[in-house]
Amino acid sequence: PVLGAANPRTGNNINDDGRPVILVIGDSLSAEYGLQRGQGWVQLLANRLQKSGSNYTVVNASISGDTTSGGRTRLPALLKQHRPSIVIIELGGNDGLRGLPVARMQDNLAAMVRASQAMGARVVVAGIRMPANYGREYTERFYAAFANVAKQHDAALVPFLLEGFSDSPDFFQADRIHPSAQAQARILQTVWPVLEPMILAKAPAKARS
């Protein structure tokens, strides 16, 4: 199985109105697969920023079914178009579900971090775990890859995107792969403590005035 099938949606970008951009490049875990529009954690993040008066805008460039190879291919054009201040990379789940080499996934993630940083963006890497039936050796190497990339390239890390509910069927859709609507706030709670310091550390001048 692969993680989903929904279309990416984009928001305002810094080239249009001068607002700093948070770019989320991910798969169905960020693309509202199986959810009503507006229920996903990325939209909840945008809502939180808006309610707090933050000057940031969120661009969701997530595509269900995407892999790190797909993200690596798509990212340069997204960076050029949106000039993000922060990039959240939420990819790798489909690499794992397909049993693709961990070394290749790690190389793709590292390339995406470097490309984002080269454009002046700060980066958050969101990790994911594979089910135990993929074998201990593979699942451990897979999970470690996200931390390795973050450490080697001085990126922030969300160790496990589905922290706190991955073993709770009530928080998943019928396929037991994709988080349900009620899980989306939990995902944001996991991402927010890592993301918030980035937002506060370099508040845009427009927000401070």
Residue ranges and their predicted role:
Residues 1-8, 123, 180:
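Structured catalytic cores of enzymes that bind and process phosphorylated ligands/cofactors
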Residues 3-64, 74-83:
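Serine-esterase "nucleophile elbow" of acetyl-processing enzymes
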Residues 54, 70-209:
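Alpha-helical cap/lid subdomain in secreted, periplasmic
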Residues 65-69:
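Acidic-and-aromatic substrate-binding clefts and catalytic sites of carbohydrate-active enzymes
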